[in-house]
From Swiss-Prot:
Stated family: Belongs to the YciB family.
Compartment(s) of residence: Cell inner membrane
Transmembrane segments: 36-56, 64-84, 90-110, 135-155, 162-182
Gene label: yciB
Database matches in PANTHER family: INNER MEMBRANE-SPANNING PROTEIN YCIB, INTRACELLULAR SEPTATION PROTEIN A-RELATED
Purpose: Plays a role in cell envelope biogenesis, maintenance of cell envelope integrity and membrane homeostasis.
Protein name per its UniProtKB record: Inner membrane-spanning protein YciB
Keyword Transit peptide: no
Classification via Pfam families: IspA
Record carries keyword Cell inner membrane: yes
Cellular component annotations (GO), alphabetically ordered: plasma membrane
Keywords annotated in UniProt: Cell inner membrane, Cell membrane, Membrane, Transmembrane, Transmembrane helix
Domain of life: Bacteria
Length: 198
């Protein structure tokens, strides 16, 4: 459910982007609805609404959600202010690389890597597996950031589709691969598997 809620602003962005631009009047003001700039405005507004509602309900936002919201406001705001989609194209790479930096930094700061802090309450794994998993997430975010940057500046007509569905597909594939990997190692930390049989 949380992943779906986080996806709502991006989905609305995609829908508005795909609309043919058309003149619209609201409160006595005329503007063009549809295309990249209307979609960017929708992304900003819907992000504020969604994450604002989550904050009111839970009293806080997760760090990842806060980073996503701030990046949306900054890069989306710059896109509208300078009327240049270049700023928005940098949003996904920068966010992914900041996540990679956070995961990498956790190897040197604190007593647990970041993935263990996130998933440790639900899984018991050997420390070496946690470390490998954390490194895998670092690689995933680096690759996602690079892929988004490459597509955004190489395939002008395709980058929004990739931003929404390509990144989602990469995430699903990675999570499936992670599940397969974890299934091979969960028993390593299960005390019951190390007990001798009578």
């Amino acid at each position: 459910m949380k992943q779906f809620i986080d996806f709502i602003p991006l989905l609305l962005f995609f829908i508005v982007y795909k609309l043919d631009p058309r003149p619209v009047e609201f409160a006595g003001h005329g503007f063009e609805f549809g295309g990249i700039y209307s979609a960017t405005a929708m992304l900003i507004v819907s992000s504020v609404v969604v994450y604002g509602a989550l904050f009111l309900r839970h009293g806080k936002l997760e760090k990842g959600q806060l980073l996503t919201l701030v990046a949306c406001l900054v890069f989306g705001g710059l896109t509208l202010a300078f009327h240049s989609e270049t700023f928005l194209k940098w949003k996904a790479p920068v966010v992914n690389w900041l996540f990679a930096l956070a995961f990498a930094g956790s190897h040197f700061i604190g007593d647990r890597v970041l993935i263990k802090r996130i998933m440790g309450h639900a899984l018991t794994l050997p420390e070496t597996v946690w470390n490998r998993l954390n490194v895998a997430w670092i690689g995933f975010f680096l690759v996602c950031g690079a892929a988004n940057l490459f597509v955004a500046f190489t395939f002008q007509d395709f980058w929004v589709d990739f931003k929404v569905f390509g990144s989602l597909g990469m995430t699903v594939i990675f999570l499936v691969a992670q599940g397969v990997y974890l299934s091979r190692h969960l028993h390593d930390a299960d005390p019951s598997t190390s007990k001798p049989k009578d």
